[in-house]
Each structure stands twice: as structure tokens, then as C-alpha cells.
């Protein structure tokens, strides 16, 4: 493990709950690029080796149901049984796996906003390190370079606090949609033009909601 960047177990797996729920700290990757690299998943496997019984989207990701960016802290869900993992992927495709993020945002006018932002995305910035939301009235170049799928973020902003929920996520989706609204995340070096170079990104994956495939009961886990 690296420094103080260690996961915290929020919920352990059981017969009726074949998942591990962890709180990932900022600065720790969700998944490894190569087997055994220090990351949230590797640390979880050290505690719960049965995670390796699951075949995931990528071989080294095993039962990891979803990722959050390295700079983001918060909740991750990891399956310990294949059937449960497969079912959760189906729920994600059906929009039944809801992830909520909370953020401190730049909002000097103290605007109160409640809206839904829906867009496609295209790579943007140096070496495609960022994404740009693309809307129906976008430029010809943007419309050519964006993907075909639309992604939706439900956003509520009150002062400098934002709560954002998504059912299906794209890379940097929430950060890019908040920046589009003129309320970028404080400490976001990619999407906040006011970033001064030293701030910590104030962004957290604070809640997940899904149906437990074993019990068919709704589950809500929050920080």
C-alpha cells in the first residue's frame, strides 16, 4: 500500500449480499493497469480474495462494478460472485444503478440551479485528456468527433454545493457538465479555469442506489 492512501470497508460481503462496498481515498486509482498494482481494487482483494473469482470487463478488474477517477474520493462497489456481477451490469445498462456525487463548486453569483444536462461527448484538450459536452446545436466539427450516445446528469446547485446523479457514466461526465453550467468543481485542474495549482479537488462519490440481485430489495449506501 502507498502512504496513507488506504481504503475503508463500508460493508462486507455475506450470503445475501455478495458485494464489498469501500470508501476510496483521493489519489488512489480504482483499478490497476497491471496485475498487483496498488489501487483500491488490489487492496480490497487482499481483504476479500473471493473477488478474484469474478471475471470482469477487463481481466485485472475482476468484480469491480464501476470506477471513479483517481482524484475523486468515495464509494466503490465490488462483486464477489459472478452471477451478482453480471446482474449489476444489466442493471447499469437499464439505468437502475444510480451514482450520486457531491462537490464544492465555483459559484460566485450564488446561483441556485436545478436542471438536467444531457449531451454526447468528444475528446478534447492536450492528447484528449479532457472531454467536451456536445449538444444538438454544436459545431460541425464537434458533432463529427463526438460519440453517438447521450449521457444525462441530474444537477442541483445551492450556493457552492452541488449534488449530481447519473445512471450511466462517461469519463469526467459530471465535472464537464458542471463546468458547462459555469460552476466547475473547486480544485479541478482540468475543468476549472480558476484553478490556482494547489487546491484539492472537492469532489466525492457520496451515494449508490441499486437492487440487490439476491434479495431483490433496493439498497442505498451513502457516506
Regions found by a protein language model. Name each.
Residues 1-223:
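RNA pseudouridine synthases
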Amino acid at each position: 500500500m502507498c502512504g496513507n492512501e488506504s481504503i475503508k470497508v463500508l460493508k462486507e460481503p455475506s450470503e445475501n449480499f455478495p458485494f464489498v462496498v469501500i470508501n476510496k481515498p483521493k489519489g488512489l486509482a480504482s483499478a490497476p493497469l497491471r496485475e498487483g498494482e496498488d489501487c483500491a481494487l488490489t487492496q480490497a482483494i487482499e481483504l476479500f480474495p473471493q473477488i478474484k473469482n469474478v471475471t470482469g470487463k477487463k481481466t485485472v478488474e475482476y468484480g469491480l462494478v464501476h470506477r471513479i477517477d483517481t482524484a475523486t474520493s468515495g464509494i466503490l462497489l465490488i462483486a464477489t460472485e459472478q452471477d451478482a456481477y453480471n446482474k449489476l451490469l444489466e442493471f447499469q445498462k437499464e439505468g437502475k444503478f444510480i451514482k450520486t456525487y457531491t462537490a464544492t463548486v465555483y459559484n460566485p453569483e450564488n446561483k441556485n440551479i436545478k436542471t438536467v444536462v444531457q449531451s454526447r461527448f468528444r475528446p478534447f484538450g492536450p492528447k484528449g485528456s479532457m472531454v467536451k459536452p456536445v449538444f444538438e446545436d454544436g459545431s460541425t466539427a464537434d458533432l463529427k468527433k463526438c460519440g453517438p450516445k447521450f449521457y444525462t446528469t441530474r444537477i442541483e446547485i445551492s450556493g457552492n454545493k452541488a449534488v449530481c446523479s447519473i445512471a450511466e457514466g462517461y469519463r469526467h461526465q459530471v465535472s464537464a457538465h458542471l463546468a458547462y453550467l459555469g460552476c466547475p468543481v473547486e480544485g479541478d485542474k482540468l475543468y476549472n479555469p480558476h484553478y490556482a495549482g494547489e487546491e484539492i479537488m472537492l469532489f466525492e462519490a457520496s451515494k449508490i442506489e441499486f437492487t440487490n440481485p439476491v434479495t431483490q430489495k433496493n439498497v442505498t449506501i451513502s457516506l
